[in-house]
Curated annotation (Swiss-Prot):
PANTHER family the record matches: DIHYDROFOLATE REDUCTASE
Official protein name in the record: Dihydrofolate reductase HdrB
Gene Ontology CC: cytosol
Protein purpose: Key enzyme in folate metabolism. Catalyzes an essential reaction for de novo glycine and purine synthesis, and for DNA precursor synthesis.
Activity regulation: Maximum activity at KCl concentration of 0.5 M and activity decreases with increasing concentration of KCl.
KW Membrane (keyword) present: no
Region (Disordered): 173-194
Gene: hdrB
Any Pfam family hit: DHFR_1
Length: 194
């Protein structure tokens, strides 16, 4: 992906907010080990920053805490929506919600305030699973090797997605997928991607 925002779809003249999952995924679907990424790819971190800056991001508490430990707070130049049942004291630029529906509403409000049409879902595994059925796109860093880990990206039916961009690198690829049909939540159906 060239760092450009994925295109949004229009309905009745209003831009619809799109949810796009962003993840670095090993060949065996591993995305984490002991609360951290089991690899260090500076190019992936730069790609993540280029992709998500200026947009709302949805994540779980553990993902937020991992980011906050490294950065000293929420991701800069993004509005973080944390999906958690815990009562957290969060700095400006981050808010906690207790349900997927509340996360969707908060992210849509933030996208409207920021003037963007795309919300990025950035982990962890449970949050990816909760949003996969409503995702319009996937922005993945696909590692060419398997890694040991305790956290995996959810299984997804590649037949429901079309690869729209690929940038092969040494040992990994940046790959963008678009859903072939509207996401289940957009159709009003309760279908999943399994």
């Amino acid at each position: 992906m060239s760092g450009e925002e994925l295109s949004g779809s229009e309905t009745e003249g209003d831009a619809a907010v799109r949810f796009v999952l962003v993840a670095a995924v090993a060949d065996n679907r591993v995305i984490g080990r002991d609360g951290t990424m089991p690899w260090h790819l500076p190019e992936d971190l730069k790609q993540f920053k280029r992709t998500t800056t200026g947009h709302p991001v949805v994540m779980g508490r553990k993902t937020y805490e991992s980011i906050a430990r490294q950065l000293g707070g929420p991701l800069p130049e993004r509005h973080s929506v944390l999906l958690t049942t815990r009562d957290l004291d969060l700095p400006e630029g981050a808010e906690a919600v207790e349900s997927v529906e509340s996360a969707v509403a908060a992210a849509e409000d933030a996208a409207d305030e920021m003037g963007v049409e795309t919300v990025y879902v950035v982990g962890g595994a449970t949050v990816y699973e909760q949003f996969l059925g409503r995702a319009a796109g996937l922005v993945l860093t696909e590692l060419d090797a398997a890694h040991e880990g305790d956290t995996r990206f959810p299984e997804w039916d590649r037949g429901k997605w079309v690869e729209t961009d690929r940038d092969d690198r040494d040992g990994f690829s940046f790959v963008t997928y678009e859903r072939k049909q509207p996401a289940a939540a957009d159709r009003g159906a309760e279908e999943s991607d399994e």
